[in-house]
A protein has these predicted regions:
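N-terminal leader/targeting pre-sequences
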Residues: 14-65, 70-173
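Sec-dependent bacterial lipoprotein signal peptides
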Residues: 1-14
Length: 173
């Protein structure tokens, strides 16, 4: 009897040792800066089972509605942030969530900034990932999150008529 108890305890303990804890989710972030290098926000990205969660907090931004996109190059040289390239579009679609031939992987909903200059956005998308692959935000040349001066009309190719780039942040682990 004692022998069976020892065998049972050994089997139970070996089962406990093989239970792995869930790995930490992949995360990345982007410090958003304006053309003068001042901090104007932060983006936090987390890989979840439902897609990539993108949370943006903005401050000291001009009030109103602004286009916000993921751009194809992880480089934010002021003052115009043209170094960030065009919208992240590894699937070769047209711009805009309202465009039947779209959207780009980097198309996001507009960011609404209050009169106080503060803004917040929290979305989850399956269009991009932090994991390796063609839609990864961390592969190749990297990517950047860019806030534009005007609202994105969500249909006009290639950039939704959202105007000049007013803030930029490189997506990094």
């Amino acid at each position: 009897m004692r022998r069976w108890l020892l065998v049972g305890a050994a089997v139970w303990l070996s089962g406990c040792a093989s239970v792995a804890s869930d790995p930490e989710p992949l995360t990345a972030g982007a410090a958003l800066k304006d053309k003068d290098g001042k901090d104007v926000g932060v983006a936090t990205l987390v890989q979840t089972p439902d897609g990539t969660r993108i949370a943006v907090t903005g401050y000291r931004l001009p009030p109103g509605t602004h286009g916000i996109h993921i751009h194809a190059v992880g480089d934010c040289k002021p003052p115009d942030f043209a170094s960030a390239g065009g919208h992240f579009n590894p699937t070769a679609k047209q711009h805009g969530t309202l465009n039947p031939a779209g959207p780009h992987s980097g198309d996001l909903p507009n960011l609404v900034v209050a009169d106080s200059g503060e803004a917040g956005m929290d979305i989850t998308t399956k269009a991009v990932t932090l994991e390796p692959g063609p839609t990864s935000l961390l592969d190749g040349k990297g990517t950047a999150i860019v806030i534009h001066a005007a609202a994105d009309d969500q249909k006009t190719d290639p950039a939704g008529n959202s105007g000049a780039r007013i803030a930029c942040g490189v997506v990094a682990k």
